């Protein structure tokens, strides 16, 4: 190669000038930059090394794992946020988000509460296999489902279903322990009284503190049950809430709860933009949702050609993210409910079904990106990770 040929490349002099500037500034700024980066990494770590300090049985189908740091530090969090556990189960590397149910004013541990899901890969593993002293890996705290004093009213209407109670438990505990000037109206839907998580604790707090209002709603009550029955309907809400103008609304639970309760809340006159939501995973019966192609059966199998990798098979009723994980193709993910956008992939050819309400950015729609956790193959696909 001819000596000095690189000097003839376009932009060579600009690169040389940039290097000189970087060397000049780098020496004086490096210490401050390094310190700032270390502090940021401490507050927002990519991974946390955690140990299981205790396991608390909440109901016959749910337990709380008390997690402590193996590095003697846990990042702060806001009541309502979650961590994602990174796991390998049966050779499948996957992740699951779990809301932190402990209060944020203590920094010694994170409590996460797991409810058993029928045929659930992760929930059954955590409930059946994990023991005190075991090690787990997680993300740092994440999520936008929290109280913001700049935009939210001091009176909170919280609608929960199943394990969707966990972020509200963190909020309630913080309000009580820190003496915050907020009120909570908690409507908690469960199939039976035996399925209610934290029921005794919430009932005690509601009896003791005037700013905590607890309304359990039981779908299949026992004969002796005297509370609200059925589902969390507009009528159930109206019986408790005098008006809506001075309240903020939060919904957390499975997709079915959100699909049912959102119209009930809107019927009260609450604008959609004033209702915060936190969904737990993809719908279990996605083929029953509006817009699902009538000619596609849940067990229909399609070929997914992952660019620069071998093709895989994916069932229509299984999210693209789950199919990739089962075939040992790891895709970054946190929320698994279509909100964080970390698992986005580009559809090069083929079609996927996405349920209404998934917050896909306009630019992603324009260039063919989807959230793989909430995208279901309805034809053969070619994708780019």
Residue ranges and their predicted role:
Residues 1-7, 11-14, 124-305:
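FNR/FR-type flavoprotein reductase catalytic core
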Residues 298-332, 336-339, 348:
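C-terminal accessory/binding modules appended to enzymatic or scaffolding proteins
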Residues 325, 329-353, 364-378:
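Local cysteine-cluster metal-coordination motifs and their immediate loop/turn environment
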Residues 34-135, 139, 153-154, 190-192, ...:
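Ferredoxin-reductase
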Residues 80-81, 295-302, 339-341, 377:
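A short, compositionally biased
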Residues 177-185, 350-359:
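Phosphate-handling active-site elements
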Residues 1-44, 267, 272, 378, ...:
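Iron-sulfur (Fe-S) cluster-binding modules
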């Amino acid at each position: 190669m001819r000596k000095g040929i690189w000097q003839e490349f376009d932009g060579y002099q600009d690169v040389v000038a940039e290097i000189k500037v970087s060397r000049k500034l780098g020496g004086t700024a490096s210490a401050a930059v390094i310190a700032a980066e270390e502090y940021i990494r401490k507050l927002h770590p990519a991974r946390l090394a955690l140990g299981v300090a205790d396991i608390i049985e909440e109901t016959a189908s749910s337990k709380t794992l008390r997690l402590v740091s193996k590095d003697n530090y846990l990042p702060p969090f806001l009541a309502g946020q979650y961590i994602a556990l990174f796991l390998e189960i049966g050779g499948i590397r996957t992740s699951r988000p779990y809301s932190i149910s402990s209060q944020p004013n203590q920094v010694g541990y994170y409590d996460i509460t797991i409810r058993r899901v029928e045929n659930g890969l992760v929930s059954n593993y955590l409930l059946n296999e994990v023991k005190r002293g075991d090690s787990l890996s997680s993300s740092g705290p994440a999520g936008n489902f929290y109280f913001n004093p700049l935009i939210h009213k001091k009176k909170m209407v919280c609608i929960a279903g199943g394990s969707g109670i966990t972020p509200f438990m963190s909020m309630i505990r913080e309000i009580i322990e820190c003496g915050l000037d907020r009120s909570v109206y908690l409507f908690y839907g469960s199939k039976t009284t035996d399925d209610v998580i934290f029921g005794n604790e919430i009932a005690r707090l509601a009896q003791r503190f005037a700013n905590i209002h607890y309304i359990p709603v039981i779908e299949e009550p026992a004969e002796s049950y005297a509370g609200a029955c059925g589902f969390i309907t507009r009528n159930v809400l109206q019986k408790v809430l005098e008006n809506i103008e001075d309240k903020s609304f939060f919904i957390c639970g499975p997709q079915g709860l959100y699909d049912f309760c959102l119209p009930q809340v809107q019927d009260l006159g609450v604008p959609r933009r004033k209702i915060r939501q936190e969904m737990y995973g993809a719908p279990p019966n996605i083929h029953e949702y509006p817009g699902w192609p009538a000619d596609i059966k849940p067990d229909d199998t399609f070929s997914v050609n992952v660019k620069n990798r071998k093709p895989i098979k994916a069932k229509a009723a299984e999210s693209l993210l789950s199919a990739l994980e089962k075939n040992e193709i790891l895709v970054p993910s946190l929320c698994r409910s279509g909100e964080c956008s970390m698992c986005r992939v580009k559809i090069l050819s083929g079609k996927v079904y996405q349920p209404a309400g998934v917050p896909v950015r306009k630019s992603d729609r324009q260039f063919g990106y989807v959230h793989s956790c909430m995208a279901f193959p309805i034809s053969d696909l070619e994708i780019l990770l």
